[in-house]
């Protein structure tokens, strides 16, 4: 029997003892790391193969306690992965769950960066900040290292899988991964259904707070359009980190949100195999993972960035797999690869800052700003027509203007918008170009949505504000008026055909 496999099984058996002493856990993991290191000469040394052009180490902290080992491929594809080793937040298993992946990834043209993060010892911000710093360095150095800064993923193993999922669900746009790979991940922070030491080491005293436990059980933090696509790799016989209450819950949350997610669940393998060749399904796993990575197409770096801001109609409420089938996704297909269209819609949101769910309080709003769009399509107002929200109608204009001038500060003084053109030249357009969409008709008064308020209150204000700032108006209320047959039963939300119709209308305007 392979010594690595045997060692892994011994560790798993020891760790199943509920009242084991922490020293036993640390000792077995340390012994495993020694065995892994002893086996390493059988593999090509990363950094000394034809696939790796450069191997070097960078400090992530001033004291050098956190470092990042960098592997740059000979033939870069533009894709990069930040690797997060496991080890129960007690040690770092950074060979089979770290550097061992370098040669395979570099062969595919993928730059690879292993973060040897500091252990939390109850302070979760310590490892989180180390990984964030790694992402900043990779994206800041993208041009020099041959990387597309919007094609940087994360790959974590076990407790490192938990940390990778935290980074994927709890990060601001600039340090959020573009895709996620989770090997047998710890997801739950409830030690009754998860790995006890990972929970205790990551949360410390906060493990006593049910709200914190829920927040960092990352299946609860998945958000539509925001949480990046994921691939989850597990074995059904994993007795250390139960798949049903960990990795499978993350997959379920992703699927319920409509986000892209692939689940690879093998019948055997236990826990802790990583990129080790002793895993019985090693070759099949790499082949499938490779295909998944190949189909993740990043936007062109010079693509025209289009931000679709809106409520549930933009979000894709009621449309299965809305990130693929909602109007922004269909708009992307219509506009083609020269554009990068992002969905920043959030259901139930209002333009009004005193509404029941103000859009400008949302993560999606911060993301839209960080996206630095060239074009913004704003489609808000439907929920503002509810009586409980429209009672603040006197503030609708100022809130709309606040959104516009935050997106484009140069419009804060309307008389100065745009640059003066030289004689014989057209004026350079203000960036981003902002399109105000009137709400589509409310074919029914579901949820107190009032089409009369939309027509007589909201749309006139939108048109006046557009005229003041020199913005274009897309009159969806008029252009969609004959498409009542493309609605869900509630009469408020378009179905997938209605989303396509909306995309067609908007695409025609953007192409003018």
Predicted regions and their residues:
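Conserved SGNH/GDSL esterase-like catalytic core that processes O-acyl groups on lipids
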Residues: 196, 302-307, 313-401, 453
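Catalytic His-Asp segment of secreted/periplasmic serine-dependent ester chemistry enzymes
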Residues: 270-276, 319, 440-512
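Short beta-strand/loop motif that positions the catalytic acidic residue
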Residues: 232-234
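Catalytic nucleophile-loop/oxyanion-hole region of alpha/beta-hydrolase
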Residues: 93-95, 100, 115-149, 276-284
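Primarily recognizes the serine-hydrolase "nucleophile elbow" in alpha/beta-hydrolase
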Residues: 133-196, 213
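Conserved alpha/beta-hydrolase "acid-adjacent" motif
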Residues: 239-246
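C-terminal catalytic histidine-bearing segment of alpha/beta-hydrolase fold enzymes
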Residues: 248-300, 496
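Active-site segments of SGNH/GDSL-like serine hydrolases
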Residues: 379-383, 406-456
């Amino acid at each position: 029997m392979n010594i690595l496999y045997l060692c892994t099984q011994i560790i798993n058996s020891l760790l199943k003892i509920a009242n084991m002493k922490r020293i036993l856990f640390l000792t077995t993991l340390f012994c495993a790391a020694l065995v892994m290191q002893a086996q390493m000469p059988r593999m090509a040394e990363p950094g000394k193969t034809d696939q790796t052009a450069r191997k070097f180490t960078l400090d992530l902290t001033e004291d050098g306690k956190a470092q990042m080992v960098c592997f740059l491929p000979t033939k870069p594809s533009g894709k990069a992965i930040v690797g997060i080793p496991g080890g129960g937040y007690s040690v770092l298993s950074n060979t089979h769950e770290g550097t061992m992946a370098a040669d395979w990834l570099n062969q595919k043209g993928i730059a690879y960066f292993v973060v040897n993060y500091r252990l939390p010892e109850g302070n979760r911000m310590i490892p989180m900040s180390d990984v964030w710093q790694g992402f900043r360095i990779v994206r800041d150095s993208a041009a020099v290292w041959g990387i597309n800064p919007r094609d940087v993923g994360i790959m974590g193993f076990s407790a490192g899988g938990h940390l990778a999922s935290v980074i994927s669900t709890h990060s601001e746009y600039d340090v959020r991964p573009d895709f996620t790979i989770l090997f047998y991940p710890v997801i739950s922070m409830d030690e009754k259904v998860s790995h006890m030491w990972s929970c205790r080491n990551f949360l410390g005293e906060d493990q006593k707070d049910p709200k914190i436990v829920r927040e960092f059980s990352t299946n609860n933090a998945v958000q539509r359009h925001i949480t990046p696509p994921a691939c989850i790799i597990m074995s059904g016989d994993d007795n250390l980190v139960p798949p049903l209450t960990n990795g499978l819950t993350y997959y379920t949350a992703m699927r319920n949100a409509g986000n892209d997610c692939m689940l690879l669940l093998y019948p055997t393998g236990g826990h802790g195999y990583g990129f080790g060749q002793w895993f019985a399904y090693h070759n099949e796993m790499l082949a499938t993972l490779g295909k998944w990575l190949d189909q993740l197409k990043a936007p062109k770096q010079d693509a025209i960035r289009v931000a679709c801001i809106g409520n549930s109609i933009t979000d894709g409420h009621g449309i299965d797999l809305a990130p693929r089938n909602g109007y922004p996704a269909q708009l992307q297909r219509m506009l083609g690869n020269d554009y990068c269209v992002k969905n920043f819609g959030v259901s139930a949101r209002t333009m009004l800052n005193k509404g029941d769910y103000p859009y400008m309080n949302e993560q999606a709003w911060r993301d839209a700003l960080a996206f630095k769009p060239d074009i913004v399509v704003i489609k808000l107002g439907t929920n503002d027509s509810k009586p409980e929200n429209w009672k603040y109608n006197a503030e609708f204009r100022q809130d709309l203007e606040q959104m516009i001038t935050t997106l484009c500060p140069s419009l804060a003084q309307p008389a100065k918008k745009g640059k003066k053109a030289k004689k014989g030249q057209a004026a350079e357009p203000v960036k981003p170009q902002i399109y105000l969409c009137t709400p589509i008709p409310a074919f029914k008064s579901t949820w107190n949505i009032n089409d009369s308020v939309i027509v007589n209150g909201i749309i006139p204000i939108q048109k006046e504000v557009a005229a003041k700032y020199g913005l274009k108006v897309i009159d969806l209320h008029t252009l969609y008026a004959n498409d009542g047959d493309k609605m869900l039963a509630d009469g408020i939300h378009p179905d997938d055909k209605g989303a396509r119709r909306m995309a067609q209308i908007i695409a025609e305007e953007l192409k003018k």
